Amino acid sequence: MWCTSGVGPYAVFAAYACTRCRNCIEVCPSYLATGDVLNTPMGRLQLVRKKAAADVLYRSFSLCTLCKRCAYFCPLGLDVAEVTRQVRDALTAAGRAVPYVAKVVNNFLRHGNNVGMPPRVVAMAARALVKKIVREKGAEPRLYLFDGERFTDALDGAEERPGERTALLFPSSSDLFEFEEAFRGYVYLLNLLGYDVVVSLRAADTANYGYYLNTQHMYKIAEMYLEEIRQVRPHVVVFGECGHGWHVFSRLVAPKSPSPVRHIHQLLFKEYSRGVLKIRRIEARQPVVYMDPCNYSRGAAPLTAEPRALLRAAVGDYVELWRNPRESVCCLGGGGL
């Protein structure tokens, strides 16, 4: 009885509602990669229905990327991503958490970012990036770092409060340490639009891996974002690029935020539509392809029109891989894969 008593009611409902029509099998990235029917939405639901042992559930549900693709091909709309979340709740409580996911969550809770960098290292990375903006653009970026008690200018390290028109930016930690062009673009564009940018050293990441671990930690990380918003009291909260992070943030953080929340795509699209943001088209040497992130096309707050409009303005024609954004295939980044 471990399974039915340990997982949430939606998981049990979906397990008994599944008609085993097999529509979900060929659309599941786990199945396409492994060829194992147990690594399909249908197979996973049958494991729940059969009250499978924890070890069996772990092997199958640890390979689900929570991409939600199955939900849009299922005649009943059964969302096995949510089933996976409820099963992982029970598995985590039983001591069977996915190790990588648990490590990332622990990094965020201890350091405020998923890669486990101490706040001083995050500050050093931010300072290095704003100096690159100075060299590239010849302008001094208005970026401030908040440590929970004071604001410092990222460029010279001096204690200084930002102006009244402030954007609290939650970037991806990978944008600070790997895809730094994205972070520099955030700061430069937000400055152009008249915002002083603040990055909290206590929550310098968009990704909420609690979504992949269990509900308790998902809410705990969401509350960390809310605490920074209350402390900084920005004019607007700007969320960087992260699919599942936006899915969770838009549901758990945005409704409780005392400041308006915008995804970076939403904010830039609005300013572009108003004519405030000018985008100069470039000549792409090779075809440009757009592939929707799972949680931009199938998440709680879809983002499909905005990135396409911005991409079209930047490169002109581009290639669509799918007839419908909701059909996009998962990149397998979800869940630590």
Across the structure, where does each feature detected by a protein language model lie?
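Short functional micro-motifs and their immediate structural scaffolds
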Residues: 23-29, 33-36, 72-79, 299, ...
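Short acidic, glycine/proline-enriched helix-loop-strand junctions
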Residues: 246-266
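Short, structured patches in soluble enzyme cores that scaffold and shape functional sites
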Residues: 171, 265, 292-294
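Cysteine-cluster motifs in flexible loop/terminal segments that predominantly coordinate metals
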Residues: 18-24, 67-70, 332-337
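Ferredoxin-type iron-sulfur electron-transfer modules and their immediate structural context
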Residues: 1-64
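Active-site glycine-rich loop that binds ribose-phosphate moieties when present
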Residues: 219-227, 267-276
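Redox cofactor-anchoring modules in respiratory/redox and cofactor-processing assemblies
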Residues: 4, 41, 274-337
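Iron-sulfur-cluster electron-transfer modules
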Residues: 15, 45-246, 252-253
